[in-house]
UniProtKB/Swiss-Prot annotation:
F-type ATPases have 2 components, CF(1) - the catalytic core - and CF(0) - the membrane proton channel. CF(1) has five subunits: alpha(3), beta(3), gamma(1), delta(1), epsilon(1). CF(0) has three main subunits: a, b and c. PANTHER family: ATP SYNTHASE SUBUNIT A (PTHR11410:SF0). Keywords: ATP synthesis, CF(0), Hydrogen ion transport, Ion transport, Membrane, Mitochondrion, Mitochondrion inner membrane, Transmembrane, Transmembrane helix, Transport. This is ATP synthase subunit a. Pfam families: ATP-synt_A.
Amino acid sequence: MMTNLFSVFDPSTTILNLSLNWLSTFLGLLLIPFSFWLLPNRFQVVWNNILLTLHKEFKTLLGPSGHNGSTLMFISLFSLIMFNNFLGLFPYIFTSTSHLTLTLALAFPLWLSFMLYGWINHTQHMFAHLVPQGTPPVLMPFMVCIETISNVIRPGTLAVRLTANMIAGHLLLTLLGNTGPMTTNYIILSLILTTQIALLVLESAVAIIQSYVFAVLSTLYSSEVN
């Protein structure tokens, strides 16, 4: 059991040992065309309300300096991460957001583009961010080092936070799932099943929260460079 504990995170398949499991990341693209020829249902109404709420919140975070349509990128980022987080909760579907390969590929280009835009177009504003307001002159060099380090590690913290939360929950679900078939006591089996259902509900909440945190922090990082 323990030797196969991390097998759920293996992107390789039995077909020529290729990493075809990454294709599950793009399953969400199959659902997009349905909105063009199906009548609006309750799910679409709820989803549109969620997107509208996110648009208003991200618009507030970006402030008056945000460009028109700038929230579309962060709403799309939220949708992509949340969809892949939920896909990983289904049996036999690969969780792409549990790999730093994907999370870093999302976080690093965003952070790098924000930094390049800020340092090229608002150089003085970016220098001012390195020294918090009210810092004593003696501590200014020290604060510049701290702010620089905290700025550089931002894409890493974004990626690791999402990956660690996905891995932790899936490991617990895998451990309970492997323990169940070896249990002959029906009372213990019912307790394991109840715990697994509760964990599944908790992981569903984590899937939403982590995608929201990723999108909100990305929005805040972009608002700092304007």
